[in-house]
């Protein structure tokens, strides 16, 4: 464990900044923004206008790798209908 910490500490500061930026951007692209896209789609799917629906398709296309990564945990099934008897 000490050798890993020593190896990281011996790297130049520019390299560490770039590594942290890559890690942060990848987390943002693969987990955080697709989570927000999911909640946005879930709340607006049945009431969206045609322009908003096109925007939703764009978001789904652009963040597809992250949505695919989150897909085992997401529920895209329609809501249960109320049937009046």
UniProtKB/Swiss-Prot annotation:
UniProt xrefs under InterPro entries: NADH-quinone_OxRdatse_su_L
Keyword set, alphabetical order: Membrane, NAD, NADP, Plastoquinone, Quinone, Thylakoid, Translocase, Transmembrane, Transmembrane helix, Transport
Mode of membrane association: Multi-pass membrane protein
Disulfide bond residue pairs: none
GO MF term (any one): quinone binding
Subcellular location: Cellular thylakoid membrane
Primary location class: membrane
One GO CC annotation: plasma membrane-derived thylakoid membrane
Keyword NAD: yes
Reactions catalysed, as given in the entry: a plastoquinone + NADH + (n+1) H(+)(in) = a plastoquinol + NAD(+) + n H(+)(out); a plastoquinone + NADPH + (n+1) H(+)(in) = a plastoquinol + NADP(+) + n H(+)(out)
Keyword Amino-acid biosynthesis: no
EC number annotated for this UniProt entry: 7.1.1.-
One Pfam family cited in the UniProt record for this chain: NdhL
Superkingdom: Bacteria
Listed transmembrane segments: 17-37, 54-74
Subunit organization: NDH-1 can be composed of about 15 different subunits; different subcomplexes with different compositions have been identified which probably have different functions.
Family from the record: Belongs to the complex I NdhL subunit family.
Biological role stated in the UniProt entry: NDH-1 shuttles electrons from an unknown electron donor, via FMN and iron-sulfur (Fe-S) centers, to quinones in the respiratory and/or the photosynthetic chain. The immediate electron acceptor for the enzyme in this species is believed to be plastoquinone. Couples the redox reaction to proton translocation, and thus conserves the redox energy in a proton gradient. Cyanobacterial NDH-1 also plays a role in inorganic carbon-concentration.
Name by which UniProt lists this protein: NAD(P)H-quinone oxidoreductase subunit L
Gene responsible for this protein: ndhL
